[in-house]
Amino acid sequence: MKTTHLIASLAIIACTTAAWFLLGAALSYRTNESTATLQKEVSGVWGPALTQEHPHAWFETPNAPGGRAQVLPSSSQVTVLLASEPKRRGLLWHRTYEVDVKSDYVFTNPTKIPQTFYISYPLPADTAGLHGFAFLLGDDDNPAQSVPGPSGRVTRAILLPASGAVTLHTGYRTRGTNTWKYHFPDNHRIADFKLTMRTNFPEINFPVGTGSPGERAQNSDGFSLVWDYPDVLAAPSIGMDMPKRLNAGPVAARIAFF
């Protein structure tokens, strides 16, 4: 092969490589730009990644820091139904979902005298609306008082007799994107807690920093998962990532770079 032919071949290869690289870079840039823009639009309609915080109560006493003694539920039964409903905007799939949460929490007065308990249930932030919201404290189901305050919490007061207990029932349906989580307060003891999650998808993946279920059973369209914390200090959060869908832009960019 002549030197000129070799140089020409190398030049063609170099130009072709550069062209593919530029194409891949352009696809990556356009995809990232489009993803950021569309993600905001989708989150505005479907809501962000949602986190449900564990509820708590307190009563006033001079023997506690700040004059308040915090009390966590003595028993918790939580049921979560997660339905993946991916939505397509442009050429991109977004990991949207619907979630139905129902919970029963038992709060117990640990003292030998009657106490006024202030029971607080935090709501997920920036939701796309809570449908069928329920906050039933014992036998009093006055919906007029079950309205969140400025902090995004529903708080009710109830007088509990010595060693008495009351059950708080909560429930709602809403929508979110990417991830759903249930979070516990740091460095607190979680007792008699059980969360059962059912999904309509088999591709289960737990977010970084969350715990794995103690039980799992696959059914026709997804999984039934159980997290059981009978007595755990600093319990890990519980969570689920939505299944990923292949998007044309990132795939084309990887092919171009390859």
Segments from the language model and where they lie:
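Hydrophobic membrane-insertion alpha-helices, especially the h-region
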Residues: 6-24
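Soluble non-transmembrane domains of integral membrane proteins
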Residues: 44, 66-226, 232
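Positively charged n-region of N-terminal signal peptides that target proteins for export
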Residues: 1-5
